[in-house]
């Protein structure tokens, strides 16, 4: 079961082409016989329109802003657009609070002078979320900088579940039993290109 928001084709807030990524995942795993139900949800930005963190596998598109301290005019347009109060004007320049920033990219798009740039688009991948009566937010697994790397991570997750999960038991209930998340997370960077990892 794969769900995706409209993505870059139809949404001005999108950071990634979520529909294309969903189609690529579907091509690889449609009708694959798995030991349990696997829901994959993709949101092209942190607005989380697909509630991706409440799925077994969640993918969120990120855009981390980069300030150019000597060039900012201090007009404050980005401050007005930021919904997290992560930006303030101080002594004629913009100061960013990294702890409050969600990497949504809104400030980058709002800069009328094009002085706010961004890191390469990133894909934050979570695992172990659950919907229903007892919802659970998925745990951060890894953040990568390309669709190709995101697909490699999904390949590793699916293979891991296929090999070790028990049939008929919800995936979330197997974490720490059949599925050792911490061990999987620790070994994952060895299986994907090092230059594609943003953070783990």
Question: Where do the model's predicted regions map?
Answer:
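Short glycine/threonine-rich loop-to-helix capping motif typified by GTGT followed
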Residues: 8-18, 49-55, 103-106, 175-193
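A domain-level signal for the structural core that forms small-molecule/cofactor-binding pockets
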Residues: 57-62, 120, 125-131
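Small-residue-enriched alpha-helical segments and adjacent helix-cap loops
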Residues: 1-77, 81, 100
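A hydrophobic, small-residue-rich beta->alpha segment in the mid-to-C-terminal subdomain
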Residues: 129-166
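Flexible, glycine/charged-enriched surface loops at secondary-structure junctions
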Residues: 34-38, 90, 163-176, 194-200
């Amino acid at each position: 079961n794969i769900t995706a928001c409209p993505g870059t084709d139809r949404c001005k807030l999108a950071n990634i082409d979520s529909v294309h990524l969903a189609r690529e995942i579907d091509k690889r795993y449609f009708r694959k016989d798995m030991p349990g139900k696997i829901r994959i949800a993709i949101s092209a930005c942190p607005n989380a329109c697909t509630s991706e963190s409440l799925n077994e596998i969640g993918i969120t598109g990120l855009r981390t802003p980069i300030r150019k301290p000597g060039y900012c005019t201090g007009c404050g347009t980005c401050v007005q657009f930021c919904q997290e109060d992560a930006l303030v004007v101080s002594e004629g320049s913009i100061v960013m609070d990294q702890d409050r920033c969600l990497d949504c990219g809104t400030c980058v798009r709002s800069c009328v002078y094009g002085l706010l740039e961004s890191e390469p688009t990133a894909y934050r991948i979570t695992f172990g979320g659950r919907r229903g009566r007892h919802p659970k937010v998925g745990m951060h697994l890894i953040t990568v900088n390309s669709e190709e790397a995101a697909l490699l991570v999904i390949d590793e997750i699916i293979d891991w579940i296929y090999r070790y999960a028990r049939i008929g038991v919800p995936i979330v209930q197997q974490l720490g039993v059949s599925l050792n998340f911490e061990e999987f997370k620790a070994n994952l960077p060895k299986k994907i290109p090092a230059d594609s990892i943003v953070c783990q």
